[in-house]
Amino acid sequence: MKFLPYIFLLCCGLWSTISFADEDYIEYRGISSNNRVTLDPLRLSNKELRWLASKKNLVIAVHKSQTATLLHTDSQQRVRGINADYLNLLKRALNIKLTLREYADHQKAMDALEEGEVDIVLSHLVASPPLNDDIAATKPLIITFPALVTTLHDSMRPLTSSKPVNIARVANYPPDEVIHQSFPKATIISFTNLYQALASVSAGQNDYFIGSNIITSSMISRYFTHSLNVVKYYNSPRQYNFFLTRKESVILNEVLNRFVDALTNEVRYEVSQNWLDTGNLAFLNKPLELTEHEKQWIKQHPDLKVLENPYSPPYSMTDENGSVRGVMGDILNIITLQTGLNFSPITVSHNIHAGTQLNPGGWDILPGAIYSEDRENNVLFAEAFITTPYVFVMQKAPDSEQTLKKGMKVAIPYYYELHSQLKEMYPEVEWIKVDNASAAFHKVKEGELDALVATQLNSRYMIDHYYPNELYHFLIPGVPNASLSFAFPRGEPELKDIINKALNAIPPSEVLRLTEKWIKMPNVTIDTWDLYSEQFYIVTTLSVLLVGSSLLWGFYLLRSVRRRKVIQGDLENQISFRKALSDSLPNPTYVVNWQGNVISHNSAFEHYFTADYYKNAMLPLENSESPFKDVFSNTHEVTAETKENRTIYTQVFEIDNGIEKRCINHWHTLCNLPASEHAVYICGWQDITETRDLIHALEVERNKAINATVAKSQFLATMSHEIRTPISSIMGFLELLSGSGLSKEQRVEAISLAYATGQSLLGLIGEILDVDKIESGNYQLQPQWVDIPTLVQNTCHSFGAIAASKSIALSCSSTFPDHYLVKIDPQAFKQVLSNLLSNALKFTTEGAVKITTSLVHIDDNHAVIKMTIMDSGSGLSQEEQQQLFKRYSQTSAGRQQTGSGLGLMICKELIKNMQGDLSLESHPGIGTTFTITIPVEIIQQVAAVEAKAEQPITLPEKLSILIADDHPTNRLLLKRQLNLLGYDVDEATDGVQALHKVSMQHYDLLITDVNMPNVDGFELTRKLREQNSSLPIWGLTANAQANEREKGLNCGMNLCLFKPLTLDVLKTHLSQLHQVAHIVPQYRHLDIEALKNNTANDLQLMQEILMTFQHETHKDLPAAFHALEAGDNRTFHQCIHRIHGAANILNLQKLINISHQLEITPVSDDSKPEILQLLNSVKEHIAELDQEIAVFCQQNN
């Protein structure tokens, strides 16, 4: 019986559990909160108070998706967390009982609210309250911001990056587009669990994590304190949680809103601080209380320029993108969340430049500025939010004393206001102003400075991170602390007020936390290149100068040593001279006494003169017959002035050696003889006749080279003008033709003018080539029997239009006897006449140009043509006439006209080659007359061979033509020309394709460009000729030099033609191409007779057999190669047997022999090289058979 109470209690417990499980919720036993935050009493209306008194209990629903930071249960089923603290405050503020129920999800909680089972739903973190007409939401209870997290050791990673990065998140928050705004190439990995997402960043699997600041910071504080760090907060997208009530519960909604309004930022910060070690932004829940004027200012100035000093840790640093980091970077991040202002950094090297030397308007805010009264005249300062003492930094030593000694070098930054005060306190110290405190730490460590003035925070950071066992710091007594704040241009008081309000809203504990965070931050590297670049360049320059000067000094010493060796050699030569004067010196040397008599000489002296004239050389130097008569007087005068001097004097003059005058470089010196009262003269000379002549010849050649260079430059300038002018005209006419506004007559005229301009350009190139041919001796005259009056008349007629356009009278008269022909090169004669006539019309502005031609008989078979071209132009001066027939020479009037300056030079040379003469007579302002005389052979026309009537050009029919050119425009033009003449044309884009087409098909003519990629026209011709191909080949080239044509003919071309190729030229050369006859080709391998006998001369059957043979052998041969490589001997022999059988049917003897050899050769590793060689022979032979089969099929189609 004593167990009955326990059994009853157990049954009751089981019943209650079963009953509880039947419900949709779990009811918590209460709220556990140790928060001592209090609220001011809520000002509720009587109506609201009565409602609360009647209500007595508020049932609040939550759901399981609430995170542990916001809401969780302890072991006694009591709720804890930030939301629990807020609910506890609500309970105390309203003095009402709260009942909390946990539902499985948000929807079930909302269903309970709508059905009246609960009064309030406390939502999870959402972007906005639910849109429901039956539900009302209060103002947000909690606001969270997206936080960017990375590893602690990589805290200086850029906050934005265009490089590929991996970013983790939870439950698709924040959205992709938000992440891609800062990381366009980010790979986003979504996790379902926050711990897993953060662990992936800590392990290095992902670069960043982005999530809610409250939940993320709580997780970091618990599990990742020493590995992860929040580096930035984003302004959006924010998340909120709300109290949700039914729409009809108006009083309840108003009471809850009063409660939310009573939660000041300070209260919210204290509530969150119990649960968050970092990332507590609860002080941002309520916006700043800005005036309308300040709000308007922010709208007008959303983006501000921030001056950033990257060398002032931990206050301010920059990452690789130049973004502001450090304490000031985090403060600016918070200000952005408060105000929406955006900050763009402008990096400077130190605060002097930042604060006072930038132009107004170039910056808006300077973070981390140290307040001073002097600087307040230039800038505005916000209220100080960091205060730190000044310290001295010195080297750490066992006997270190915390004081400054006399003579120490102490550095102080320019922008510290302590300079004058410290100078008074320590007058015996040498104070050195520096640009930046952080950069001076290294100088203290190296001993360049004895001490440095810095702020305590800056010193602590630099020593802990870079000089932990080398430097230490101590406080400076008797000086005020440094006050750090923001500075602004004096014209921006509104910005100052806004920043002050933002700073005042930041709790001091948050500023301290940020400071400690950055002081303890590991692995932060400061790029000091800008600070030391100037010193680096100076040191580098000095080093280069030092090395250069050393090299120069070494080079100077080397030259000195070499010079010393030369002098030493001269001394040795003098000693040798004293010992053996006559044997050692090849140049003539002699000794003269003070009276001028030659007392000794060497053999070279005697050999220099003829035997007869040697006597004169031995006469006293003062004798008028002596060749050295001019030497003695100069020697005597010099000696009288410098008797003790051993200077060698030289003189260049000419002497007679008995045969000719020779130029010598004569030298003499005084030699005092200790045993004699008088000194002697040691003399000699060097014959420099050849040297002088050589120098003169070199000078002549040098002048020629200079003149050639000048002529070349003049030629290039002239050719540039002469080629550009017609090309510009052609382009202009083509541009007109591309339009649609021209009439038919205008289009014809434009085409005609463009063609004529092109012909003039070809004429210019022809002139240049004529000069080349003439000067190289390659110009060959081709004399013919010519009717000179008719030739002159036709040439004059071609210039009639030009003369008429200038209103110049052009007349042509002749006294030639009738029926006489002369033997002369008509092209050369016409070129001379055209040049002279063109010049006459060019330089005549008014008047007339007259041409007269006459024939002066010498005998019955010989005569002289005399022709004059007279104009009334500007005329030539004598100086201009002297230069007229030189290459590229132009008169002053000629430079105002177009022309190459080659025409008259060519005329002169052509007339000279025809054994004639060209002269001129000209007077300025009157005109010029050119006279041509040429001796010629003559014959009466009746006795001459009558010229055959011009036969019409007959073109061969049915030509198969292949053109090879890599330029599609050239191929198209030539194809259209040949199509116009009625020929079928095939095309190849280079020599390789042309070779392939020729091997596969028969052609009657190949026209190939000379310059092509891979295989050019010359190489293509050589390869075809190596194959014994008789195919006619014409080469085309734009290089109009004669050697290019010779190169083409030498490699086997039938013709080498110059571009452009006109229809007339094509017709002329095609007409000379023999008509293609149906000739039975010679076959090297195919036995056509056997094939005819086997097929009863059935051409169709013959072609089918040959095509079948081609198809089968092209299948069997690769199979044989593959079988041999795979070791399949049976398949190999089957393939070779089929090839052997086909060869027997067609009586292909060479193929029969090779395939038989393959069949009888056993396959082994030793015989494989021989078999492969035989297979390659089969392959080459089948390729030759393919060509012959192609020719046979084409001939019989």
From Swiss-Prot:
Its EC number is 2.7.13.3. Residues 960-1074 form the Response regulatory domain. Residues 22-325, 559-1197 are cytoplasmic. Activation requires a sequential transfer of a phosphate group from a His in the primary transmitter domain, to an Asp in the receiver domain and to a His in the secondary transmitter domain. Keywords: ATP-binding, Cell inner membrane, Cell membrane, Kinase, Membrane, Nucleotide-binding, Phosphoprotein, Signal, Transferase, Transmembrane, Transmembrane helix, Two-component regulatory system. The chain crosses the membrane at residues 326-346, 538-558. InterPro entries: BvgS-like_periplasmic1, BvgS-like_periplasmic2, CheY-like_superfamily, HATPase_C_sf, His_kinase_dom, HisK_dim/P_dom, HisK_dim/P_sf, HPT_dom_sf. GO terms for molecular function: ATP binding; histidine phosphotransfer kinase activity; phosphorelay sensor kinase activity. It catalyses: ATP + protein L-histidine = ADP + protein N-phospho-L-histidine. It is a multi-pass membrane protein. It is found in: Cell inner membrane. Residues 718-938 form the Histidine kinase domain. The keyword Endoplasmic reticulum does not apply. Pfam families: HATPase_c, HisKA, Response_reg, SBP_bac_3. Residues 1098-1197 form the HPt domain. Residues 347-537 are periplasmic. The modification Phosphohistidine is found at H721, H1137. One of its GO terms (cellular component) is plasma membrane. It comes from the Bacteria. Member of the two-component regulatory system EvgS/EvgA. Phosphorylates EvgA via a four-step phosphorelay in response to environmental signals. This is Sensor protein EvgS. It comes from Escherichia coli O157:H7.
